[in-house]
Amino acid sequence: MKQKLIKAYMTTAQTFAECSTARRLHVGAIVVKDDRIISIGYNGMPSGWDNDCEDKDYMSRDAGGWLDPEEIYERWPFDETVVVANDSESFEIDRRYRLKTKAEVLHAESNAIAKLAKCGESGEGAIMFITHSPCLDCSKLIYQSGIKKVYFGQAYRDSSGIEFLEKCKIEVEQINV
């Protein structure tokens, strides 16, 4: 495949990533076969569900005692002010939190592969373009769907998905657009 097409398809995957309603990470994936896009996907909640992909995970009161301030801000990067009131007074408190992805969120790759099945298309011999490297579960789906090559943009902290694909003799290539 020509380099300019590879860049164009990866840019398309990045464009679909912007459709994600997730706040932590936007991921897009497209499946290409015979020089045409046959499926797209991005991370998000199942069809018909609300679009809130994350829960707030609040810092426990004990955590402040054993972590220095820099570690607290790194682990719980967000804060919000909450008004607490009783019958006689009200006051504001700051609470730190991090965003935790809900278990129900579908990954971009699994969404793209599910759409293939829904439309009666085959992934056999296709190429997948993903904005981020796939997790292990998505890599299993990629393998089972018959996709022969994967291009990805950013590496994710867990490389087990890439290792699985390579073990299955699926070509994997990281590209920067």
Feature locations, PLM:
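Zinc-dependent deaminase catalytic domain
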Residues: M1-V177
